C-alpha cells in the first residue's frame, strides 16, 4: 500500500522513525511531518502565511522511506502529503504519550492529522503509546524496541485493510497502547470516551525579569467511570481502539464494534 506517515512530535521522534522504517519493509512509505514538536495543536491549519515543505536528509530513516519536513501543523502535513503522494491510508504516530478521553479529540495533533485525512476522504490510523509522565511533551530518548507492540498492531491492521478493505462505517481509528511493562495483550474497542481526565489549574510564576508567567497543568481526576476508554487503559492496562466517525454512518455502532473486535483479535493473535 501507499502510506503517508506523520505525527505531532516532529520527524526526529523515535516513534515516527521506528514506525516508518518498519512499514517501509512491506509498503511504499512517504513521511511528511512537522520539523519541530507541535503537541496539543489539534487539527489546526495554517492560513496566515505560506507553508514550507522540503526534503529531509537528516539520517534516522532507512533508504526506502521518502521524508519531507514542514513548518506547518500535522494537519498541514497531511493536506500537503495527500496532494503530493495520493496515499491509500494515513498513519499518524507513534505519539509519545497516550491520547485517551474526549478532550484528546480536540487537542491532539496526532488525532487531528487523521481527522484532516478523513475529511479529505483518506482513512487514517492515529497511534499513541504511554510514556513516563515527565516525557509527554518532550522527545525522550526511547529505544525503537519500545514501540514494537504497537507497530505490530498497526502493521497487522494495514495488512488486513490491504486484503479486505477499510472498516465499514468508520473514518479513522485511534489506538492507545499502555507502556510495554503494563500491556499484557488485552484490548477493548471503545464506544464511550471519558469526558474529562484532569482537573486543570493555573500555575503562576515569574520570568527572570520579574514578569508574570502562567502554566496550565492539572492532576488526574478520580475515580474513572468503568465503561470508558480511560478505565480500560489506566486501570486494566488494555490497548484501546476507538473508531472515529465524522457525521452519520449507515452502519450501526454495534456492527462497527464487532467488526473492529474481529480485526484486532486476529492482529493480536498473529
Swiss-Prot record:
A divalent metal cation binds at residues 8-9, 39, 95. GO terms for molecular function: 5'-nucleotidase activity; metal ion binding; nucleotide binding. It catalyses: a ribonucleoside 5'-phosphate + H2O = a ribonucleoside + phosphate. Its EC number is 3.1.3.5. Pfam families: SurE. Binds 1 divalent metal cation per subunit. Its cofactor is a divalent metal cation. Its main location: cytoplasm. GO terms for cellular component: cytoplasm. The keyword Secreted does not apply. PANTHER family: 5'-NUCLEOTIDASE SURE, PHOSPHATASE, PUTATIVE (AFU_ORTHOLOGUE AFUA_4G01070)-RELATED. Belongs to the SurE nucleotidase family. Nucleotidase that shows phosphatase activity on nucleoside 5'-monophosphates. NCBIfam families: surE. This is 5'-nucleotidase SurE. It comes from Caldivirga maquilingensis (strain ATCC 700844 / DSM 13496 / JCM 10307 / IC-167). The lineage of its organism: Archaea, Thermoproteota, Thermoprotei, Thermoproteales, Thermoproteaceae.
Amino acid at each position: 500500500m501507499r502510506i503517508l506517515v506523520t505525527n505531532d512530535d516532529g520527524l526526529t521522534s523515535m516513534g515516527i522513525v521506528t514506525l516508518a522504517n518498519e512499514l517501509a519493509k512491506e509498503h511504499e512509505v512517504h513521511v511528511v511531518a512537522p520539523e519541530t514538536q507541535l503537541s496539543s495543536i489539534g487539527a489546526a491549519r495554517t492560513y496566515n502565511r505560506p507553508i514550507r515543505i522540503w526534503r529531509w536528509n537528516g539520517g534516522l530513516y532507512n533508504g526506502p522511506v521518502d521524508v519531507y519536513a514542514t513548518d506547518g501543523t500535522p494537519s498541514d502535513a497531511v493536506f500537503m502529503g495527500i496532494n503530493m503522494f495520493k496515499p491509500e491510508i494515513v498513519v499518524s504516530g507513534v505519539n509519545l504519550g497516550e491520547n485517551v478521553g474526549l478532550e484528546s479529540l480536540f487537542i491532539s495533533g496526532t488525532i487531528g492529522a487523521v481527522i484532516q485525512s478523513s475529511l479529505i476522504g483518506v482513512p487514517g490510523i492515529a497511534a499513541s503509546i504511554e510514556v513516563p509522565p515527565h516525557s509527554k511533551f518532550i522527545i525522550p530518548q526511547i529505544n525503537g524496541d519500545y514501540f514494537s507492540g504497537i507497530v505490530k498492531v498497526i502493521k497487522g491492521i494495514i495488512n488486513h485493510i490491504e486484503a479486505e478493505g477499510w472498516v465499514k462505517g468508520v473514518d479513522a481509528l485511534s489506538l492507545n497502547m499502555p507502556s510495554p511493562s503494563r500491556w499484557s495483550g488485552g484490548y477493548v474497542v471503545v464506544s464511550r470516551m471519558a469526558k474529562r481526565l484532569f482537573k486543570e489549574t493555573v500555575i503562576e510564576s515569574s520570568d527572570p525579569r520579574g514578569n508574570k508567567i502562567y502554566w496550565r497543568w492539572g492532576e488526574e481526576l478520580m475515580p474513572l467511570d468503568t465503561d470508558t476508554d480511560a478505565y480500560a487503559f489506566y486501570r486494566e492496562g488494555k490497548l484501546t481502539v476507538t473508531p472515529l466517525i465524522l457525521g452519520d454512518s449507515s452502519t450501526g455502532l454495534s456492527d462497527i464494534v464487532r467488526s473492529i473486535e474481529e480485526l484486532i483479535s486476529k492482529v493480536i493473535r498473529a
